[in-house]
Amino acid sequence: ALHGAADPQALLKQWHQSLQVGGFVMFSCLGPDSARELREIYQALGWPPAGHQLTDMHDWGDMLVETGFSEPVMDMERITLTYETPERLLQELRELGRNFHPARFGALRGRAWKKQLLQVLAQRLPRQADGRLALTLEVVYGHAFKAQPKIRVNALSAVSEQDMRAMLQGARSKS
């Protein structure tokens, strides 16, 4: 998953190298507002972060340009997932991936902690009109093209005396 890449800039460079000029890349990944309800609960309880920090769509656009892509277009949307129970919510979060945050709890948690987590989720997560628990995911969409390589122009150019004479003689013979 792109949002879990340890070095997204390196991944974009690989994509850029793999494409032909005129080719394009399209992607989607989770954005920083994903599971914000869960992060707020963890923070209120003084627990380590519930997930690693996700990259903002504007930063994705900047990385695309820095990598050599052109005409990046970025967009995002928020999707609300609903769950009948806290257990089902946790099951789906586990299926989506793992917590890459460097400050995450490094050991296994016990049954008492899980029981407390389930109770807190049932009490504090927002609920829909039908009583289902709600969790927001931000999905970032992007695409960009691989442009022609740019010609590097130096501030200082060198012309040999012989080339200069040839250019001057060519200009005189045309007049």
Residue locations for each model-derived region?
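A short SAM/SAH-binding and catalytic strip from SAM-dependent methyltransferases
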Residues: 1-9, 29
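A short glycine-rich, Lys/Arg-flanked "PGG" loop and its adjoining helix->strand segment in the class I
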Residues: 9-24
